[in-house]
């Protein structure tokens, strides 16, 4: 066993040019873990707090020196001397020291960076790859799978400066036999989509997550462009590739009148009408997964949507559940959605993240491991997806090195594990096995 001897926090830059927190945890024996906190654009109101300085003279108020100071002072003083492998104890120490419901004293960005850096240092001290150590922490040592990628190839909503209301249009290469093959298929469709958009005189500029961000007449147009790209790449939509969407509905939900206002299309829907709008898209295209298909507070709308679509479509709660076991437990009891999106920084520690994945799986929900729109070269989510055998991962498109870092780490892991980590493909998606 190796004790923590030093903790260092620093301000680094994320993929959107904003500061974020990086933590370095040193153990006895010279073992070091380095981790950075990601940052979201479309955020759930009940997420753990990302602490920003608010000093307009630095980074337009988005500096994180307060969170870094918490790492270097209070957090460091509290955990130096503790065993590096005592992950849950270290996480709980930080949570208790913060003392707030949403980690607003130190910031979830500070606590998470230290939590993940600790896990990396501990894995190194045990001579284990991070995914193997995560599997041990998860209580499932040696149980792995390679995740099916949800590849966000058209960006809209808060992730792009365009008129497309739905935030993410994704492809899932279900016909692949391996993760590496899935990435090849995704790349081929991505490049063909660029050609399709250019031929239509549309922009091939990319959004925060590496997908294209053209102005389109409708959400159905985005799906039609993807269909054309899939076919041009030589694949069959529905057989080789299925589709997924992240509506991020809270971003266009008007709380005053209770309507979903899709300004890009000039349409407004009631809660039930929006479910049927999505249902019609699912009839026209092989959409097998929909994320945040209602506003985070519209639980009646989610219940109706689950009743209408839940037996044939994976309904993923992101802003709905915010990786929080208290909220997820209530959702499970009420039969809301059937899957959860897992984002480390929504809850703020590795221990709490693993608890959310376990609760979801125990209830028959799927868990989709996810990046944020503001990312770094940190690829921990790749190891999390494999080490928990989650089955699915969302980490952007086939461009931007902050996204590709995760895919490349998955390639390395698949190579190392071979048959020990099966690629589940379509079977990983709720309702599709």
From Swiss-Prot:
Cofactor note: Binds a second Mg(2+) ion via substrate during catalysis.
One Gene Ontology cellular component: phosphopyruvate hydratase complex
Record keywords, A-Z: Cytoplasm, Glycolysis, Lyase, Magnesium, Metal-binding, Secreted
Compartments in which it is found: Cytoplasm; Secreted; Cell surface
MF annotations from Gene Ontology: magnesium ion binding; phosphopyruvate hydratase activity
Swiss-Prot/TrEMBL catalytic activity: (2R)-2-phosphoglycerate = phosphoenolpyruvate + H2O
Active-site annotation: 209 (proton donor), 343 (proton acceptor)
Stored CDD domains: enolase
Binding residues annotated for Mg(2+), in chain numbering: 246, 291, 318
Pfam family, one: Enolase_N
Gene Ontology process terms (BP): glycolytic process
Pathway it works in: Carbohydrate degradation; glycolysis; pyruvate from D-glyceraldehyde 3-phosphate: step 4/5
Enzyme Commission numbers on file: 4.2.1.11
HAMAP family xrefs: Enolase
Oligomer and partners: Component of the RNA degradosome, a multiprotein complex involved in RNA processing and mRNA degradation.
Main function: Catalyzes the reversible conversion of 2-phosphoglycerate (2-PG) into phosphoenolpyruvate (PEP). It is essential for the degradation of carbohydrates via glycolysis.
Family per similarity comment: Belongs to the enolase family.
Full protein name: Enolase
Gene: eno
